[in-house]
Amino acid sequence: MSKATETNGTRPKLPVGKILTRTIKMLWEFYPVLLPVALLATVVQAIMQSLPSVFLERILSIISNYIDSGDWSSAEGLVFQNVALLATFYVLGLLANIVSTQGMAIVTQGALQKWRSKMFSHMQDLPIRYFDTHLNGDIMSYYTNDIDAMRQMIGMSLPQLLFTSVVIISVIFIMFYYSALMALVILFGASLMALATKNLGGKSAKNFVKTQKTTADVEGHIQEIMNGEKVVKVFSHEPETIESFDKINDELMVVSRNANLYANTLMPILNNMGNIMYVIVAIVSGVFIALNVQNISISGLPFTIAVAVPFLNMTRQFSTQINLISGQINSVVMGVAGANRVFEMLDEPTETDEGYVTLVCSETIDGQVQEAEYRTGYWAW
């Protein structure tokens, strides 16, 4: 048992970048058409999600002009056109969401099925020494814990990160289009949120990786003890068995507690930072309007309420996307850890087949084993 555990603990770990690259490359090989279609639909959905701020500014500008001129008849048509166009974009976003979610569901489950088949086929060709140095429970965890972690990463985390990245890039472009000064204010607050995510999320991620490995060790230990339970009872080895299990079980408790401690602390902190950033943006916008601060923007529009209100909406969007990223980091880390173990198993060298073995009758003459032409009850090959 100790030998197997020690062997598992010293296996080399692949770099995270190579693991993700290899995972995506294999997904592309499995689904060369459906995967890019699903990813493209995710990008379209993200762009549609970023557009409401643009239409909000347009509608507020139209209403503001109506208040000044009193000509509602001309403003009514423009408002209806913008609302209808926004509704069209929402419908496109809904259709893109359907294509994205359904496509990624097919890709995820199909890819996992192919990985399980590849692992099982590869396992049949592994040498006996591999099974002598790896616990049965540890091998089983490839098909359960590790595959499930990959499912979470491929089916939810990676599409969510792509969606969030596109939304953030789109919102940043829109912010600088309307006001560079306000964009810098929001980016400063976002950088503080990113710093908190890096510090707390990094500590949480390390413990989630340890949790993934320790869970496999616990399963391997339990599987080994269950298979040898009769031997344990015959030799009255129950106290030592309980002691060894308590040790590894306590280790799993510690790493799981630390992982969830940091993860559960991060989200409330980010939510409150997002609320503070929202208030700061509202105050700064009011000051800019009151002092008639000259706006610096690509659009050339003055800084008015029509510009300020969409920035409040974009502040919410920005903080929400950062929260979503922080929530997916742990799933990605656990998925990478699971993929690393799966790829290590697939990369194990197979047993060399040097032909068939023929059994013959043998006898020992002068200390040398020789082939006998009659039945001796002893065999050699």
What are these regions (language model features)?
Residues L135, G220-I222, T350-T364:
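Solvent-exposed, non-transmembrane helices and loops of integral membrane proteins
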Residues P36-L40, P52, F80, A84, ...:
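Internal alpha-helical transmembrane segments of multi-pass membrane proteins, especially GPCRs
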Residues K25-P32, I128-R129, I147-I154, L158, ...:
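An intracellular "coupling" helix at the cytosolic face of ABC transporter transmembrane type-1 domains
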Residues G9-V16, M48-S64, D68, F89-N136, ...:
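Juxtamembrane helix-loop junctions of ABC transporter transmembrane domains
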Residues A96, S100, T108, T144-G189, ...:
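Hydrophobic alpha-helical transmembrane segments of ABC transporter permease domains
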Residues M1-Q49, S64-L85, S100-M104, T108, ...:
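Membrane-integrated ABC transporters
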Residues N65-I67, I174-F188, Y262-N340, L346, ...:
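Helix-loop-helix
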